[in-house]
UniProtKB/Swiss-Prot annotation:
It is an enzyme of class 2 (transferase). Its EC number is 2.7.7.6. It comes from Psychromonas ingrahamii (strain DSM 17664 / CCUG 51855 / 37). The keyword Transferase applies. This is DNA-directed RNA polymerase subunit omega. The gene is rpoZ. It comes from the Bacteria. HAMAP family: RNApol_bact_RpoZ (MF_00366).
Length: 91
């Protein structure tokens, strides 16, 4: 399954090097950041799930960049709100 997925995913991405970078980034999101898979996991490991998502054009570097920026913005907004609440409590 994984070998066919790699070959098919390379056709989507263009070359193996970009595929490796994209798949490892997505697999890390799935494994450690609690991201929800966009395909049925079927008891596959995060790397295979990432390859399947790439193969089906469900995830791209651009999409992951946008998601990362949104999450960073939300985190910063929450931190600023917490600081403002603390400052108001002291003032």
């Amino acid at each position: 399954m994984a070998r066919v997925t790699v070959e098919d995913a390379v056709n989507v991405v263009g070359n193996r090097f970009d595929l490796i970078l994209m798949a490892s980034r997505r697999a890390r999101q799935l494994a450690t950041q609690g991201k929800t898979p966009l395909v049925d996991p079927e008891n596959d490991k995060p790397t295979v799930i990432a390859l399947r998502e790439i193969e089906e054009n469900l995830i791209t570097n651009e999409l992951m960049d946008i998601q990362d920026r949104q999450e960073k913005h939300e985190k910063q907004t929450a931190e600023l709100a917490a600081v403002a609440a603390i400052a108001e409590g002291r003032g």
